[in-house]
Regions:
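Inter-Walker segment of RecA-like/P-loop motor cores
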Residues: 304-345
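Conserved C-terminal RecA-like helicase domain
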Residues: 486-594
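ATP-dependent helicase/translocase motor core
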Residues: 1-285, 294, 298-309, 338, ...
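Interdomain helical connector at the RecA1-RecA2 junction of SF1/SF2 helicase-like NTPases
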Residues: 167, 418-519, 536
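A short beta-strand element within the Helicase C-terminal
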Residues: 354, 592-594, 599-623, 642-646
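Long, hydrophobic alpha-helical segments
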Residues: 424, 632-678
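Conserved RecA-like ASCE ATPase "motif II neighborhood" in helicase/translocase motors
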Residues: 330-361, 365-376, 383-398, 573-581, ...
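Post-DEXD/H (motif II) to motif III coupling segment of the RecA-like Helicase ATP-binding lobe
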Residues: 367-452
Length: 678
């Protein structure tokens, strides 16, 4: 018995709890299993009996510390004697909340030196009161980072939890999440240890000293996958689902978890459409359609971590590879958006098979070479506008009948009307709604993205600054007045004049203000490629004249002739266009001039300023401005760091564009005088 305990402790210290729960431990050449996963309907009876033998238990006021023997944890949940979750319970009636007191307790009174709080020894640590719940996967003193585990208000109205007529707002935690089957599902299908391989591309030993973070689902991620699986089990094959999740939702992980779980789904009854048998899986393959190379590798790494045979996964970069993967019955096939036409044709030719088509409509097709390939195949130029992936997919679907042997799952943050009508749920009044919603407002309020409209102003709005300064004498200094004269008294009708305003602001208010620990960058958005080229020349000329220590880059597709001279992105930047995003990461490159390319699907957390001289409306306006919303905690990035100066559009049109995706947005019509001093 002591040998067993010793080996368990050694494996926990070396590999962590997730590994121990998912793998055998070996004691004197005898293999022991410490947890049996939840079976599917297709599993043997013996597997179901083993799962039933798992012992889940709860203790109250659990002592745990050799350092502070009197310390107690309010609640600990175990499986087969291994702690899974700790919970600190707070009561607002005694003026204690989870958001403050619960988190403070973990940060200040729970030492990571105590075994139960060693990183990787538990799956998550919860701070809970009757209104809200929060969790962390790593107790790390003052650096402990908590995330909300809340449902969000109805209809995307923001963070928190809705009123529960039958009890506490957080009752869902014990009624639905901390239950035997759900906990087992989380252990087997959601929790992962990240060793940093996806980012670095290097293989490392999967031991705790190399572990970077423990991945645990937020509530909306667990909820969307659970609801989708439940609906498919009931209905069967052939439905379309729209998952409208904002940036900051962790969409990549949600998509990955869905792919892994959907291939194991069995029908709940034979009434489920295209069900073959109650113990037979509904889908032959899940096809993930994406253009994000990072997501491609992330899916592969995650599924490998889940213990799935890599022989069941295929990467289809060509039509031939895609055809072979489908014919060979690969369970998970990862392909690109430009292969979507071939997918539609291929699956219609194998009508006896069922497919789950998971579309990552992250609008990332505009961020790289893959975009150019798809645009070429559709005779579309992204720099002529309207070239994001859901428009392309929508066009393809109109040209091809959607196969009834497929279920379609579309993930997007900003669905267009056509996408909503094709994939959404129609209510009794004829309105369409997404199957699942995680709104921009909730993401902002929970701190996962920033509010890009916090400091949005039109050029005309600068006139309001004059009165602000007159009414606030403390700001009426020579520096402010000099800046205002240059900005307000000039009507910038020419590109050169507008470029001077842009560079003046960026250099004085962003670069020399050392925003983001002196890492801040900007994007200039122009109406077309010709304007982009002219802006690039104007900005570069001024930067050279002023001897500024940073460069301006440009991004556009193809070749463009301006004033009799031919230009390409690669020639202007001095390196291949496939390297533009990577080169823009360098400190020396601070401003990126674009027309349409990089307006969607481009994630650069250092972007803090945007200068717009282009008509924007609807979804494209939201997508463009959202280039600034990525958080960067390591750089201290907050909404107040952002600044958008718009020479073309109105505050009213921007509010109208954002309203469908962000309820109750507050949009200031004029910038506050304080921008002169930030």
């Amino acid at each position: 018995e002591k040998e067993v305990e010793k080996q368990i402790d050694m494996d926990l210290r070396t590999f962590g709890l997730i590994h121990v729960l998912k793998n055998d431990i070996c004691v004197q050449n005898i293999k022991l299993r410490l947890f049996f996963p939840r079976p599917s309907a297709a599993d043997a009876e013996a597997t179901k009996e083993k799962y039933a033998a798992n012992q889940f238990s709860v203790t109250r006021q659990q002592t745990y510390s050799l350092i502070k023997p009197g310390n107690e944890i309010d609640m600990v949940i175990f499986v087969n004697g291994l702690p899974l979750f700790t919970l600190e319970l707070k009561n607002p009636w005694t003026f204690q909340t989870a958001a403050y007191d619960g988190q403070k307790q973990y940060k200040e009174d729970r030492s990571p030196k105590d075994t139960i709080f060693n990183f990787g020894r538990c799956l998550a640590h919860f701070a809970v009161d009757k209104d809200e719940a929060f969790f962390t996967t790593k107790v790390d003193g003052p650096k402990t980072f908590f995330m909300p585990f809340n449902k969000g208000l109805p209809n995307g109205q923001g963070k928190g939890n809705p009123v529960n007529p039958n009890g506490h707002k957080t009752a869902y935690l014990w009624e639905h999440v901390l239950r035997r089957d759900t906990i087992a599902d989380i252990i087997s299908n959601y929790t992962l240890m990240d060793y940093g391989e996806t980012k670095t591309g290097k293989k490392v030993a999967h031991i705790m000293k190399n572990a970077k973070r423990l991945i645990f689902p937020r509530y909306h991620q667990l909820d969307v996958v659970t609801r989708l699986i439940d609906d498919v089990e009931t209905y069967g094959v052939g439905k379309r689902y729209l998952i409208m999740h904002s940036a900051g939702s962790g969409k990549s992980n949600s998509l990955t978890w869905l792919a892994y779980k959907i291939i194991k789904v069995c029908p709940r009854s034979m009434e489920a459409r295209r069900a073959k048998a109650l113990d037979m899986q509904l889908f032959d393959s899940a096809i993930i359609v994406t253009d994000r190379r990072l997501l491609d590798k992330q899916i592969t790494d995650n599924i490998r971590a889940f213990g799935h045979s890599m022989n069941t996964i295929a990467h289809a970069d060509s039509s031939k590879e895609l055809k072979e993967a489908i014919e060979q019955g690969k369970r998970i096939i990862i392909t690109t958006i430009q292969k979507f036409p071939f997918i539609c044709d291929s699956i219609s030719n194998v009508g006896h098979k069922n497919f789950a088509i998971i579309i990552d409509e992250a609008h990332s097709s505009q961020s790289g070479i893959a975009a150019d390939k798809m645009n070429a195949s559709m005779q579309h130029d992204p720099d002529t506008g309207g070239g994001d992936s859901d428009v392309m997919i929508e066009k393809l679907m109109k040209d091809r009948k959607m196969s009834d042997n497929c279920s379609y799952f579309a993930f997007t943050a900003t669905p267009k009307k056509e996408t909503l009508e094709r994939f959404g749920i129609k209510d009794d009044e004829g309105h369409f709604h997404p199957f699942h919603l995680y709104s921009m407002k909730q993401a902002i309020e929970e701190g996962f993205i920033l509010n890009v409209l916090a400091n949005y102003t039109t050029y005309k709005g600068y006139y309001e600054l004059v009165k602000s300064i007159q009414d606030n004498p403390e700001y009426n200094n020579e520096k402010a007045q000099k800046f205002l004269r240059r900005v307000v008294e000039r009507d910038p009708k020419t590109i050169e004049a507008k470029a001077e305003v842009m560079l003046e602001h960026f250099d004085t208010k962003v670069y020399r203000s050392h925003k983001l620990k002196s890492k801040a960058k900007a994007m200039v958005v122009t109406r077309d490629i010709e304007c982009a080229i002219r802006y690039y020349h104007a900005l570069t000329k001024m930067a050279t004249k002023l001897n500024l220590p940073y460069r301006i880059l440009i991004a556009f597709s193809g070749e463009k002739t301006v004033d009799g001279q031919k230009y390409t992105e690669a020639e202007m930047n001095g390196f291949p266009d496939k390297d533009t995003a990577e080169r823009f990461e360098l400190d020396v490159n601070r401003i990126l001039v674009v027309a349409n390319k990089y307006l969607t699907g481009f994630d650069q957390p250092k972007l803090t300023a945007m200068y717009i001289d282009k008509p924007l409306d609807g979804v494209i306006a939201v997508q463009a401005l959202s280039r600034l919303n990525r958080s960067a905690p390591q750089l201290g990035k907050v909404s107040e760091d952002l600044f958008i100066l718009d020479f073309y559009n109105s505050t009213e049109s921007m509010k109208e564009a954002f309203d469908p995706f962000f309820t109750g947005i507050e949009l200031s019509a004029a910038t506050d005088v304080n921008i002169l001093h930030t």
